[in-house]
């Protein structure tokens, strides 16, 4: 919780619209409209000011209908997306993206944009599938980038980048951590590996872990909430830490892990096996408020102790 609390920007009368975050989510297809919504909605509930969703034309009306808070852009072509990315504070690519091969050139342009402009960047879901399929073309020195694989996505990345064929059968947590460190070094990016214990591994070998109790329900969409919240936290961490991307990735990664695991646990405690991702999202505003209220109480207690 302390990592999360450190990242929350102070709300003051001097803030302007956009100061707390302008975030882009790139994903959404005919089949998958929930994933980009979950990623974007998590960002909205955490307090980002402007959330843009870039999606396939077939997905746009559906995503628009989910929430009036989101700015939805239909069309998945570089000429329309890249100029708008110049205004974004962080980019999340992959939730509900789909695997249409025609998307790969767009992703290559986005990767190059991120590398050159050093924008906080998260690759999740189908974005990771494309990276696995085109590992030899993934750029080096993507210093702002975090990959967020689950175990299946992690196994694909390890097979493509490291030649490891049997990762799904690895049971040892220390061996998985070793593979995550090898993958991070080989790809020169941070790996946020989701699992029973979440790992954040940076290319220099540093490892952070989060084992906060989480939901026992493994419903779809929790990874999208992780990706969205991580994107916003990366921006907030950058504001606090400047270009110290290693520290920013650890602070943001552990904050995202704690948030999603805690919100999921609260939702599961209330709803049991009926818990789903919308119910998890509903817990985020309450969780943020609880953290801020605790901070205010601690501050008042500290001030009182001085007199």
Swiss-Prot record:
SUPFAM superfamilies cross-referenced by the UniProt entry: Ribokinase-like (SSF53613)
PROSITE patterns (UniProt xref): YJEF_C_1 (PS01049), YJEF_C_2 (PS01050), YJEF_C_3 (PS51383)
Protein name: ATP-dependent (S)-NAD(P)H-hydrate dehydratase
Residues that, per the record, bind ATP: 194-198, 214-223
Residues where (6S)-NADPHX binds: 96, 150-156, 224
Keywords for this protein: ATP-binding, Lyase, NAD, NADP, Nucleotide-binding, Phosphoprotein
Enzyme Commission designation: 4.2.1.93
Catalyzed reaction equations: (6S)-NADHX + ATP = ADP + phosphate + NADH + H(+); (6S)-NADPHX + ATP = ADP + phosphate + NADPH + H(+)
Pfam families per record: Carb_kinase (PF01256)
YjeF C-terminal domain sequence ranges: 1-291
Recorded superkingdom: Eukaryota
Class of this enzyme: lyase
Physiological role: Catalyzes the dehydration of the S-form of NAD(P)HX at the expense of ATP, which is converted to ADP. Together with NAD(P)HX epimerase, which catalyzes the epimerization of the S- and R-forms, the enzyme allows the repair of both epimers of NAD(P)HX, a damaged form of NAD(P)H that is a result of enzymatic or heat-dependent hydration.
Keyword Translocase in record: no
Record GO biological process: metabolite repair; nicotinamide nucleotide metabolic process
The protein's required cofactors: Mg(2+)
Family recorded in the similarity comment: Belongs to the NnrD/CARKD family.
GO-annotated molecular function: ATP binding; ATP-dependent NAD(P)H-hydrate dehydratase activity
């Amino acid at each position: 919780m302390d990592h999360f609390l450190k990242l929350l920007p102070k709300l003051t009368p001097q803030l302007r619209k956009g100061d707390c975050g302008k975030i882009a989510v790139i994903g959404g297809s005919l089949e998958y409209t929930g994933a980009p919504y979950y990623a974007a909605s998590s960002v909205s509930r955490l307090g980002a000011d402007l959330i843009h969703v870039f999606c396939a034309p077939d997905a746009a009306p559906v995503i628009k209908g989910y929430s009036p808070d989101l700015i939805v852009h239909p069309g998945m072509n570089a000429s329309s997306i890249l100029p708008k990315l110049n205004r974004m504070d962080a980019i999340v690519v992959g939730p509900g993206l789909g695997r249409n091969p025609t998307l790969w050139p767009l992703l290559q342009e986005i990767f190059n944009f991120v590398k050159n402009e050093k924008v906080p960047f998260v690759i999740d879901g189908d974005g990771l599938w494309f990276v696995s399929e085109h590992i030899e073309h993934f750029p080096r020195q993507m210093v702002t980038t975090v990959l967020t694989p689950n175990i299946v996505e992690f196994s694909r990345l390890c097979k493509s980048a490291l030649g490891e064929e049997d990762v799904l059968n690895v049971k040892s947590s220390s061996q998985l951590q070793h593979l995550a460190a090898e993958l991070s070094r080989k790809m020169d990016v941070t790996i946020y590996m989701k699992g029973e214990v979440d790992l954040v591994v940076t290319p220099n070998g540093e490892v952070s872990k989060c084992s906060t109790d989480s939901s026992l329900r493994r419903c779809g969409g929790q990874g999208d909430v992780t990706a969205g919240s991580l994107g916003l936290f990366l921006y907030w961490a950058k504001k606090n830490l400047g270009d110290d991307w290693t520290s920013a990735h650890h602070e943001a990664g552990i904050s995202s892990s704690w948030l999603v695991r805690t919100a999921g646990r609260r939702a599961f405690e209330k709803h049991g096996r009926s818990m789903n991702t919308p119910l998890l999202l509903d817990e985020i505003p309450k969780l943020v408020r609880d953290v801020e209220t605790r901070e205010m109480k601690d501050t008042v207690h500290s001030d009182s102790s001085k007199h």
